């Protein structure tokens, strides 16, 4: 028996943001996106990112997790404020995590 799942994939996992697709159960790497009069094969691993932080249906952090990826995200949690996320090069200064985002904001000051 073939099971059919309706899944919405976000841009972070597959470049068809907000597209509704129909998937047949079986090998994840063999799923296809079905459009009217058109079938497009998903690239290998499109649905199986292997990221334990990511809800594969919503492409958002799983319940209780802060982030999916980023320079200030480790083990699905934001790194502490003040953690170096980008080491200084040349006359630049280090960039630091804020503790409330997975992004690494640029330090506006120079040495």
UniProtKB/Swiss-Prot annotation:
Disulfide bonds join 53-76, 67-73, 72-97, 85-104. PROSITE patterns: DISINTEGRIN_1 (PS00427), DISINTEGRIN_2 (PS50214). It comes from Macrovipera lebetinus. Belongs to the disintegrin family. Dimeric disintegrin subfamily. Residues 1-20 form the signal peptide. Pfam families: Disintegrin (PF00200). Keywords: Cell adhesion impairing toxin, Disulfide bond, Hemostasis impairing toxin, Platelet aggregation inhibiting toxin, Secreted, Signal, Toxin. This is Disintegrin lebein-1-alpha. One of its GO terms (molecular function) is toxin activity. The keyword Lipid biosynthesis does not apply. Residues 47-111 form the Disintegrin domain. It is found in: Secreted. Gene3D superfamilies: Disintegrin domain. Its main location: secreted. Heterodimer with subunit beta; disulfide-linked. It comes from the Eukaryota. Strongly inhibits ADP-induced platelet aggregation on human platelet-rich plasma. Also avidly binds to the laminin-binding beta-1 integrins (alpha-3/beta-1, alpha-6/beta-1, and alpha-7/beta-1) in an RGD-independent manner. One of its GO terms (biological process) is cell adhesion. Expressed by the venom gland. Residues 21-47 form a propeptide. GO terms for cellular component: extracellular region. InterPro entries: Disintegrin_CS, Disintegrin_dom, Disintegrin_dom_sf. Negative results: does not interact with the collagen-binding alpha-1/beta-1 (ITGA1/ITGB1) and alpha-2/beta-1 (ITGA2/ITGB1) integrins.
């Amino acid at each position: 028996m073939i099971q059919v799942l309706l899944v919405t994939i976000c841009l972070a996992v597959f470049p068809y943001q907000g597209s509704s697709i129909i998937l047949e159960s079986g090998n994840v790497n063999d799923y296809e996106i079905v459009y009217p009069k058109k079938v497009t094969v998903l690239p290998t691993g499109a649905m199986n990112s292997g990221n334990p932080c990511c809800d594969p249906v919503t492409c958002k952090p799983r319940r209780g997790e802060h982030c999916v990826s980023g320079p200030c995200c480790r083990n699905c949690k934001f790194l502490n404020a003040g953690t170096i996320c980008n080491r200084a090069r040349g006359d630049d200064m280090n960039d630091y995590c804020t503790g409330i985002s997975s992004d690494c904001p640029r330090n506006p000051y120079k040495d």
